[in-house]
Amino acid sequence: MRKILKQFLAFCIITLVPFHAFSKTYNLDIAYKSVNITGNFVKKIAINGTIPGPILRFVEGEEVEINVINNLDEDTSIHWHGILLPGEMDGVPGLNGFPGIKPGEAFTYRFKIRQTGTYWYHSHSKGQEQDGEFGALIIDFKDADPVKFDRDYVVLLSDFHEENASNILANLKMSSEYYQYARRTLTDFFYSVEKHGFRRAWENALMWGKMRMLPTDLADVTG
């Protein structure tokens, strides 16, 4: 009789434990992909086969689960930029005990959505973000949106370079002006003298000489 009572109590305890169901689950497959944007095929990193990755859409208050599978030959990660969440779910390797995701392994992010707005997610490992591992993240209001609109468009801007990010970083370490193809020449100085006079042209040249960027440098990486 006592044995039956114990089994009955155990059954009651098990059935009373709440089952935690997640409101939304996404699976993100990180893998290399050959892409042609400039007319040449180059190796980049895609999420679920696309660059940028898929738009992740949530609703305020949802409990979400995101499974990230690493099919690269190096560690990877996903950081949820601007999202309020537990530290261990932030996705920055080396912080809050998160080691990153090893090749061939997966990691499941679980957190509750506590805000609304337009955000983005991206790798926080090496230069993988620059190589294509990023995407948009939209969080809708739980109740009616305070702003009326006919249609919601998501615009995600990004630079693209045929070189991989590790090569770009190595080149910039050799010289911060490595990609500065339109550098000023002596001819430009004479043109400035003709237009503004020698004194102003000389002072202008000295001023730029003290700076870390050239006047023709519109971006860190060009071409």
Describe the residue ranges of each PLM region.
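Bacterial N-terminal signal peptides that target proteins for export
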Residues: 1-9
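Cleavable N-terminal signal peptides
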Residues: 10-11, 21
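Histidine-centered copper-binding motifs that mark active-site loops
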Residues: 23-223
